[in-house]
């Protein structure tokens, strides 16, 4: 299957369009840019994902009170973009197992997928405890706070996560995108370069850095960054598309044109 987090999706995203059109306005949300928390539905999930949903669904229907079965089914539904159903399954599971932190964490993510950010934050708070924090949940809480426009508070959560896993590129990537949302592109680039320099940095980190570099008008450099994950021709085409959108922002008389609606996605 083609990698879902391709830079083509990133550079053609509604998020980038909104950033360019609104100057990173307050209505923009981190879920539109990063897949660390919420991923948009894939219109054509591959056969492996569909099979996983079928298998998990059969197990769940055979024993809907089983926490592990509900968790697996909810995660499979999320992976194929079936957000509302995932939230419904996980909600029932958390009612049956109110103290199950894995279920609470998954339900919190599913709530965020559906745009219920405050409820997601409340649920995620119950998914771990101050004396035993989970850095992954801290990072997700940060992205939810960014969705709510509470960027300073979000960064405190990222800092707490980084205290547990110093230099973790996925957390640094979320932190960098938080700075994108507050219009501080140089700081965003600084943080994303920290993530980029990690031996554990994945394609999402490189694509996010390429986006931020491109948003600052350094297109050749952006192309060299994203080329690591794409054929040269595709990388060039995507950076050219970003350049076109930037030109469109600077010349509004050119009209908005037609922009494909897609976004970066990744593990939740």
What do the predicted segments below correspond to?
Residues 31-36, 199, 203-205, 212-268:
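Terminal, low-structured helical/coil segments at or just beyond the last alpha-helical repeat
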Residues 2, 6-10, 16, 20-72, ...:
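N-terminal leader/linker segments that initiate helical-solenoid repeat arrays
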Residues 67-68, 101-102, 134-136, 151, ...:
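Helix-start (N-cap) detector for alpha-helical repeat units in TPR-like alpha-solenoids
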Residues 72, 106, 139-140, 174, ...:
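Canonical tetratricopeptide repeat
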């Amino acid at each position: 299957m083609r990698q879902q987090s391709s830079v083509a999706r990133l550079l053609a995203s509604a998020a980038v369009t909104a950033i360019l059109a609104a100057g990173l306005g307050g209505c923009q949300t981190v879920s539109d840019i990063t897949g660390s928390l919420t991923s948009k539905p894939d219109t054509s999930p591959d056969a492996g994902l569909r099979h996983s949903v079928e298998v998990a669904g059969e197990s769940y229907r055979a024993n809907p009170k089983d926490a592990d079965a509900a968790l697996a089914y909810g995660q499979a539904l999320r992976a194929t973009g079936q957000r509302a159903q995932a939230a419904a399954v996980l909600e029932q599971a958390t009612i049956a197992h109110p103290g199950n932190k894995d279920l609470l964490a998954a339900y919190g993510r599913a709530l965020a997928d559906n745009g219920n950010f405050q409820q997601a934050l409340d649920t995620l708070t119950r998914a771990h405890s101050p004396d035993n924090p989970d850095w992954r949940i801290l990072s997700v809480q940060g992205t939810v706070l960014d969705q709510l426009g509470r960027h300073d508070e979000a960064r405190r959560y990222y800092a707490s996560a980084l205290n547990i896993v110093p230099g973790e590129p996925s957390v640094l990537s979320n932190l960098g995108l938080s700075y994108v949302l507050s219009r501080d592109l140089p700081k965003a680039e600084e943080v994303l370069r920290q993530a980029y320099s990690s031996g554990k940095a994945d394609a999402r980190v490189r694509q996010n850095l390429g986006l931020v570099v491109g948003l600052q008008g350094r297109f050749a450099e952006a192309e060299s960054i994203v080329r690591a994950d794409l054929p040269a021709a595709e990388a060039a085409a995507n950076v050219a598309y970003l350049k076109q959108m930037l030109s469109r922002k600077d010349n509004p008389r050119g009209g908005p044109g037609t922009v494909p609606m897609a976004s970066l996605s990744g593990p939740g």
